[in-house]
Amino acid sequence: GKSILQSSKWTYGVIPDEKRTMIANEVVGMLYKMLQEEIEVLSSHHLVEAIYSDLEEVLYKLMLAEKTYAYELSCYPEKEEQFITEYNNLNRVSLALKFMMEYVAAKPPKGEVTLGIGKYEYILAICSLIIEWAYKNDLFHYNIFNTPVEILKSDRIGMKQDEFYTIYQYGDKYRREQLYYNSSSDFHKKYTINQENYSDALDIAFQAEYGYSFTQFCRLIMGMIEYGKEREEQEVYIAPKEKLIEYIVQIDEKLSNEIAIAIIKDISLTERDDFLKVPSGFRKEDVYPWRFNRAYSFNRRPVIIRNDMIIWGNRQLYHMLMYVTDLIYEGKISTKNDKMCTLIGRISDDRGRKFNKLISDILSDMEVFVIDSNVDRINKKPVADKNGNTL
């Protein structure tokens, strides 16, 4: 708030609604400048490795929490709020770490200051605030929030928390249900949606989209993970690019040098002139750390290339593979390729039909309702909205 006031563009009091995005943009800009200044003085020596090590630790804790939540709750129901708070904090730290990693990978610092704990936490706090304010700016821009913004006499920027709390409640309820469901899946095997085998079609679509098959994509990742497993004393792995590719090609005859190089390129973050300027072929939003489902993000590109060296962690690689697979099977992966679009449409249609059957089975087993599945007409009249669109 103090920095905003010093710009002489703003004064104390409530900001007009039409200027909320303006002040949010200014806050994000100031925070981003602070981030640039803090990172550019750092030494690159072991910087990526330090961030990556923390990312691996946080991911381990997140995966553990997601697998054990239902069991922990059964044993210690009085600790539910503590579990949720810790889980949410881990997610916030993970987002900040990924943002810092994406920035450092794009703009490796050339300073001489060794990153200390205090400086590290300060930079992560800046990263977290950028994500928070930029996300709020989107909420203002799309008129999702009507919350007034006010510059307080204490030189802080204040907002009433009612709307934030309401949205948080909805998200919190969903997160708890999802955590409980995913961590107790062994207890509810009766009702499941079994996916069809799309492996052949997925290989063809992947080949058309990226120049290699999904099978080759998976095998390359498994090869890198195997390379890491042979070096169990480490958690973050560093290998010369040529040596790693030679290793993978030797243990997997299905992969060639050309394919391995192409896949590694597509799952890597590299240095570029401007962090905010997206590489060719991507949307500008793909480098915004507060946006979801970004094609050019650490979630999709957990390999860091530094000169001719490759840096990665096995947990992040495996998480990326699961993440991409989920995007495909949930119909969320961005694509302009006809074959991939056709496959995504087919998967979505199949998933919809299976979901309808699942709900029908659950209701039928209650032995209370008469269930007719896939009904599109009632008394010979189409089930449609007021515009005639079939429901």
Language-model features, listed with the residues they occupy:
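Acidic, metal-dependent phosphodiester-chemistry machinery of nucleic-acid enzymes
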Residues: 1-369, 375
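Active-site metal-binding core of divalent-cation-utilizing nuclease and nuclease-like domains
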Residues: 372-391
